[in-house]
Amino acid sequence: MYILLTLLTKSTMESSCDNFEGLEHYYYTDAEPSSKCNKFQASGGSGVVMAESHIMSSEAPPKSNPGLNIRTNCRMILNLLREKDCSVTFSPEQPLTPVTDLAVGFSNLSTFSGETPKRCLDLSNLGDETAPLPTESPDRMSSGKLESPKTQFVQFGGLFTPDLAWKAKKCPKRNMNSVLPHLLCSTPSFKKASGGQRSLSNKENEGELFKNPNCKPVALLLPQEVVDSQLSPTPENKVDISLEEDCEMNILGSPISADPPCLDGAHDDIKMQNLDGFADFFSVDEEEMENPPGAVGNLSCSMAILLSGPLLNQDVEISNVNNISLNRSRLYRSPSMPEKLDRPMLKRPVRPLDSETPVRVKRRRSTSSPLQPEEENCQPQRRGTSLKKTLSLCDVDISTVLDEDCGHRQLIGDFSKVYALPTVTGRHQDLRYITGETLAALMHGDFNSLVEKFFIIDCRYPYEYDGGHIKSAFNLHRQEEVTDYFLQQPLTPLMVQKRLIIIFHCEFSSERGPKMCRFLREEDRASNDYPSLYYPELYLLKGGYKDFFPEYKELCEPQSYCPMHHQDFREDLLKFRTKCKTSVGDRKRREQVARLMKL
């Protein structure tokens, strides 16, 4: 063969060496294959004989260009030798283009002899339904005859080489249904309608489906039929997709669905082959598939019954309240238990009938217990004096306390009698006020049956007193004067049944009169043992001389009114205020000295 090639090349090189640049390009024409060349057979040395016979039987080129005929023959021989080295065979049915030639050549490689190769699993494209997939050659699609319902895919060398005989010995048929409970929440399990009907002539592709693990993760729970529909361009599979969508809508009614059982042995083979290499880790006998254990096989069924079953009605009889047990309620009782409610009506258990204690008597008298009538009937009558609940401060109404306080306030300073004159409320809550009308009635002798003698103390400054005052009133504006007049020689009534009362007032009875009244009470308390007092009944004229003068001028002398801040008595006001403050300071110092001497 090499000798022939050398002779042809040498003769061609002598004629025209510059025309061999086109040897690298070779194209088939649209003429019939029998008129151009015979098929080159890739077997031993028969290729040379076929090439020689082809050269001898080819048509003679035109005589005008003998060098072109030699170059054409050399190109044909070189291309046939190149095709022999690549071991490429051509289809005898029709001429093939270079792209179709490449596809058919790879499909006829010896690596894929005896089975239909499938593409490897690409996990990144599972969610993309429109991803382009490699399909078979166009000449087989145009023929309209498919040996297998599954589409054949071109797989390039080195990616996947199945070995069914080795896997059949190493991995026997197993079933994963009894190992892992198929609780596909929100993901129904599909079963193809035409999965059990397979062509008998498709024996070489039987059991050669794409192998993927049956136990998919949550993110990869895709139906097997959807994947098959993506790999098949035939219209029959498109019809199956619509049927599968209807099946999906029917199955999505329940949140938990079990994987449907296999109907034939071929489907079991498909499931076991989908396990790929994971069957060694999750292998279970086929007998366990038919008779699954109770703990695992009934898991999905029991959960489905629990979620989809009707609600249990718990009958509660209100009339049988007395028959309910008096035990503490269970906090964590299951709401699905069919038993009746035996909850207690009382917080505390019933004491034995023979325990006669005061605690039991108190509980028997409680109105919150529904068992009160029965306990009263069963309780024997106690003889003698019964224990009574003492009155505590918590049980006393606050209004009662206030009423009692008001009752105590109606008593005079030594708590021996009530006030002889009607009193009213005023600015100072600790002092007793009388109105001008009451003072006028007192001066007219309306209270002579109760009052033996009364004193009206005018606490205003002397210029105010000289400008107008109440008849028979004493002007005592200094504390020393009050102490000397009432405490140096205390006054006592001649009759024990009658009273000796003192009435204080100033211009408004808001500052000077209340201060003098409190001072006398404090000095009187200090001079006597509590609660004894020389002058237990003290009053304040409400509104002072200002309110009394307009209404009762006849009881005032002179019948005039001189205010404290009169323009003509400013100097007198400053002088009397200074004396009052000095006297107050001296009094405080004397009190402190007296206290130190007592210590």
Curated annotation (Swiss-Prot):
One of its GO terms (biological process) is positive regulation of G2/M transition of mitotic cell cycle. The keyword Cell division applies. It is an enzyme of class 3 (hydrolase). Gene3D superfamilies: Rhodanese-like domain (3.40.250.10). Residues 125-146, 334-384 are annotated as: Disordered. The active site is at 506. SUPFAM superfamilies: Rhodanese/Cell cycle control phosphatase. Its EC number is 3.1.3.48. InterPro entries: MPI_Phosphatase, Rhodanese-like_dom, Rhodanese-like_dom_sf. Keywords: Cell cycle, Cell division, Hydrolase, Mitosis, Protein phosphatase. Pfam families: M-inducer_phosp, Rhodanese. GO terms for molecular function: protein tyrosine phosphatase activity. Residues 339-359 have a biased composition (Basic and acidic residues). PANTHER family: M-PHASE INDUCER PHOSPHATASE 3, M-PHASE INDUCER PHOSPHATASE DUAL SPECIFICITY PHOSPHATASE CDC25. This protein functions as a dosage-dependent inducer in mitotic control. It is a tyrosine protein phosphatase required for progression of the cell cycle. It may directly dephosphorylate p34(cdc2) and activate the p34(cdc2) kinase activity. Belongs to the MPI phosphatase family. This is M-phase inducer phosphatase 2. The lineage of its organism: Eukaryota, Metazoa, Chordata, Craniata, Vertebrata. The gene is cdc25-2.
